[in-house]
């Protein structure tokens, strides 16, 4: 990376553009520097690198309880108000966060705030377990038990209660009078009052239940996701701690070395009757988990899936689809390539095993 920086910026020492490397890979807190969603600090696991648009804050000794207590305080209304007094809404520079006072905590206060933050983190992680692109992904929402729909509402209610408990503690720590508390708890600024600026944070749209289910089934067919999680044949790993290094794979993904649902050479095909027919495999996956098979899966795969997939796997200007379609102009015949398994032999296999026999 240092060599790339020197090349990219026309020589000179790499330290001109890579700063504070002694803090790389430490656990800490991070936040988007510019966002119209309001100040929102979150846990930054060990093993990460911060940057200009995603700065970081640390504590001496990297103590997890101290970090969690700071996380709770920094997301309180009191802290947010003190930040807003120093600069415009939507812009959260490092210097402003650094200058905002943090009250001294007793051991009891630190533990109480840390427990609240840890519980909120766990609830948020549970909510992310139905998001395919999350490192916490387990299963799509459509495969959760009916009671989980009520559970998701309960998660939101409990998170709101945790925010209220943190706010109450923070008000006391900062010495807010009752009248000041009522003012801080007043209505939030309307969207029309917020100036439009460049936003460093992407907001994920909710995925339709059926599309999410079909996308997961495609992933199982390609060997991306593990069918055994849905059937109960494989137990889930225990929940990590907030500052544990991120896993190389989400819990719902197929572990390295495990037998995939369908053996293939990184290529599946849209061709009825073919042993590697993607549509047949998707329908077989849904049958194994006793999920209803939607009508016109083949039409959905041809007309809608890639646009849906590309949007799901895009962030800002970076597009990173993992399933690549190679189709005829009419779209009546297509090969689907699985990017993580591509090799120097993939195109030869596509031509010799799939295309040549059709000529």
Tell me the role of every PLM-derived stretch.
Residues 47-52, 93-98, 141-150, 193-198:
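Short acidic (Asp/Glu) and glycine-rich catalytic loops that position anionic groups and cofactors
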Residues 4, 31, 35-37, 63, ...:
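Short loop/turn segments at secondary-structure transitions that flank enzyme active sites
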Residues 1-60, 114, 126, 148-152, ...:
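Polyanion-binding catalytic cores of nucleic-acid enzymes and NTP/SAM-utilizing transferases
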Residues 168, 179-359:
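Terminal accessory regions of large proteins
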Residues 22, 32-99, 109, 114-115, ...:
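Basic, amphipathic alpha-helical recognition segments used for DNA target recognition
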Residues 23, 46-49, 62, 66, ...:
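Secondary-structure capping and boundary motifs in well-ordered enzyme cores
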Residues 62, 75-79, 101-105, 118-121, ...:
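Hydrophobic alpha-helix feature that most strongly marks membrane-spanning transmembrane helices
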Residues 96-171:
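Extended amphipathic alpha-helical segments enriched in small hydrophobics
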């Amino acid at each position: 990376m240092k060599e790339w920086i020197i090349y990219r910026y026309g020589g000179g020492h790499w330290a001109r553009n890579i700063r504070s490397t002694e803090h790389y890979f430490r656990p800490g807190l991070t936040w988007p520097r510019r966002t119209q969603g309001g100040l929102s600090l979150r846990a930054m696991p060990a093993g990460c690198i911060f940057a200009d648009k995603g700065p970081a804050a640390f504590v001496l000794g990297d103590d997890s309880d101290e970090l969690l207590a700071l996380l709770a305080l920094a997301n309180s209304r009191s802290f947010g108000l003190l930040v807003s007094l120093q600069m415009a809404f939507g812009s959260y520079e490092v210097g402003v966060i650094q200058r905002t006072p943090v009250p001294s905590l007793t051991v009891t206060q630190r533990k109480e705030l840390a427990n609240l933050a840890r519980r909120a983190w766990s609830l948020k992680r549970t909510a992310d377990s139905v998001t395919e692109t999350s490192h916490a992904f387990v299963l799509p929402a459509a495969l959760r038990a009916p009671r989980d729909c009520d559970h998701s509402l309960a998660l939101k209610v409990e998170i709101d209660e945790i925010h209220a408990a943190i706010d109450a503690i923070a008000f006391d720590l900062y010495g807010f009078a009752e009248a000041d508390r009522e003012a801080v708890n007043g209505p939030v600024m309307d969207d029309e009052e917020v100036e439009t600026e460049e936003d460093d944070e992407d907001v994920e749209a909710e995925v339709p239940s059926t599309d999410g289910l079909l996308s997961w089934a495609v992933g199982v067919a390609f060997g991306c996701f593990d069918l055994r999680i849905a059937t109960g044949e494989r137990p889930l790993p225990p929940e990590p701690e907030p500052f544990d290094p991120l896993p190389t794979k989400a819990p719902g993904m197929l572990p390295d070395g495990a037998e995939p649902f369908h053996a293939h050479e990184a290529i599946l095909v849209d061709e009825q009757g073919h042993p590697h027919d993607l549509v047949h495999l998707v329908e077989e996956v849904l049958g194994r988990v006793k999920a209803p098979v939607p009508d016109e899966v083949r039409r959905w795969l041809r007309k809608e899936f890639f646009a849906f997939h590309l949007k799901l796997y895009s962030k800002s200007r970076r597009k990173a689809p993992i399933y690549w379609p190679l189709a005829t102009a009419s779209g009546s015949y297509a090969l689907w390539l699985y990017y993580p398994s591509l090799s120097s032999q993939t195109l030869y296999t596509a031509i010799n095993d799939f295309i040549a026999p059709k000529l």
